[in-house]
């Protein structure tokens, strides 16, 4: 369901530098670090507006694309919307004692595989001969304009794998768009809030699923380990991805592996809720998605963060693909007009505050968090709910949604947070 499932870049598409011309000393309008959703989406949007005579996409190949997928809802006007192989026009949501199936119009819920994104990228940048994808690792950047606060360009150091070892090259770039954090100091992984998920790709012996409807959140699953929900994305009447996700709060011990109870709960859901009497498992998707509450990385000179580093993954849901598209389009528009892309990232302080408030409720009072999600999903039309979750709702629409929600859990969680901060004292 969620967006951030790392998979390997297809070796047939990003070519190794040895198969083309030498890179050392070359100059690029942009170097894009990372070939996942953020990097490839940005390349597509740059090509779409006709910006850049030389753009280099560098991916280390350690995170495969083959089994990766992204999901989002959109009205169909996006650059990559037509590349999605799945588009559902209805949404199912459920909880203890209630079940709702609603039309998504004017939205559709779309799912795009890594292979589809890679193919769409090749198609869109195909006419831009200066756009190149290589396998390599960006080791660092030397930003000439960082101290001055402008973009004077960068020298980018790249390690390129070759049959007999690694070749290091330096290239020049007017802009560097970073989705991985090439110049970030490694720090111990903190126990941040995150989503812990396991999904089973199943094929049933009989018709079980409705290919036109996605089950976005079904809370009819065990809640003892934290707020949990089921998700179903059908690909036919007999096949689907059936996934279980748990919110893991900040401060909880990070697991060494995905909770083994997930699979038992998925199997129970298949049989007890969906009525699947016989099925076989054709694949698994497992992982965690950080629900980042810290401020996003900021642009420094010519180095511009993109993707999750730029705050494009929504902290309360883990969705980010549509936000990445909007950011990529904004960057491309700035560059096409001769403006700096440093301010292209939207500032959503209000929505970040709402996300943090909801995460506090999830951590302090999971039962009330379930109630809040149930109210949002069951008492509001899909258009209002999805626009709100997409941070695209009008003030009037937001107020109407808030009027349906219980406010006491938010107030209680806020008071607890303030009390904790006072007890801990000022941060060093």
Role assignments for model-derived ranges:
Residues 309-330:
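A conserved FAD-binding loop/helix module that cradles the flavin
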Residues 41, 45-97:
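N-terminal FAD cofactor-binding segment of flavoenzymes
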Residues 252-285, 304, 325-348:
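Flavin-binding catalytic cores
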Residues 224-227, 287-306, 311, 361-367, ...:
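FAD-binding beta-loop-beta segment adjacent to the flavin cofactor pocket
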Residues 45, 124, 128-279, 292-295:
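Predominantly flavin-linked oxidoreductase catalytic cores and closely associated redox partners
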Residues 72-145, 153-154:
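A conserved beta-strand/loop capping segment in the N-terminal third of enzymes
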Residues 18-56:
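N-terminal Rossmann-like FAD-binding beta1-loop-alpha1 element of flavoenzymes
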Residues 329-428:
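C-terminal helical "tail/cap" subdomain of flavin- and related membrane-associated enzymes
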């Amino acid at each position: 369901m969620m967006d951030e499932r790392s998979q390997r870049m297809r070796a047939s598409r990003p070519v190794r530098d040895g198969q083309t011309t030498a890179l050392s000393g070359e100059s690029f309008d942009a170097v894009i670090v990372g070939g996942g959703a953020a990097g490839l989406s940005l390349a597509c949007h740059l090509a779409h507006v006709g910006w850049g005579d030389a753009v280099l996409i560098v991916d280390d190949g350690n995170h495969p694309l083959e089994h990766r997928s992204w999901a989002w809802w959109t009205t169909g006007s996006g650059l990559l919307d037509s590349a999605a192989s799945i588009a559902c026009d209805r949404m199912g949501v459920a909880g203890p004692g209630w079940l709702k199936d609603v039309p998504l119009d004017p939205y559709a819920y779309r799912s795009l595989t890594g292979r589809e994104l890679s193919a769409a990228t090749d198609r869109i940048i195909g006419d831009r001969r200066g756009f190149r994808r290589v396998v390599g690792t960006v080791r660092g950047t030397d930003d000439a304009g960082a101290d001055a606060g402008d973009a004077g360009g960068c020298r980018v150091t790249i390690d390129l794998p070759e049959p007999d070892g690694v070749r290091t090259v330096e290239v020049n770039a007017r802009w560097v768009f970073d989705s991985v954090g090439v110049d970030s100091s490694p720090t111990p992984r903190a126990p941040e809030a995150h989503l812990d998920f396991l999904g089973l790709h199943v094929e049933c012996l009989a018709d079980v699923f409705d290919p036109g409807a996605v089950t976005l959140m079904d809370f009819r699953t065990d809640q003892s380990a934290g707020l949990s929900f089921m998700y179903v994305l059908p690909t036919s009447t007999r096949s689907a991805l059936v996934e279980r996700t748990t919110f893991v709060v900040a401060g909880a011990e990070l697991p060494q592996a995905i909770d083994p109870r997930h699979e038992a709960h998925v199997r129970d859901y298949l049989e007890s809720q969906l009525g699947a009497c016989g099925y076989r498992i054709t694949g698994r998707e497992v992982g965690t998605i950080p629900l980042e509450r810290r401020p996003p990385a900021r642009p420094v000179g010519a180095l511009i963060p993109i993707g999750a580093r730029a705050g494009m993954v929504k902290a309360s849901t883990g969705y980010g693909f549509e936000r990445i598209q909007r950011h990529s389009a904004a960057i491309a528009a700035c560059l096409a007009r001769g403006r700096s892309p440093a301010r292209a990232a939207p500032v959503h302080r209000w929505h970040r505050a709402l996300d943090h408030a909801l995460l506090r409720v999830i951590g302090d009072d999971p039962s009330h968090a379930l109630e809040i999600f149930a109210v949002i999903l069951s008492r509001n039309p899909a258009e209002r709910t999805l626009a709100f979750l997409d941070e695209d709702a009008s003030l009037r629409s937001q107020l109407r949604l808030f009027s349906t929600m219980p406010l006491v859990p938010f107030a209680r969680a806020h008071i607890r947070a303030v009390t904790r901060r006072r007890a801990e004292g000022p941060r060093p």
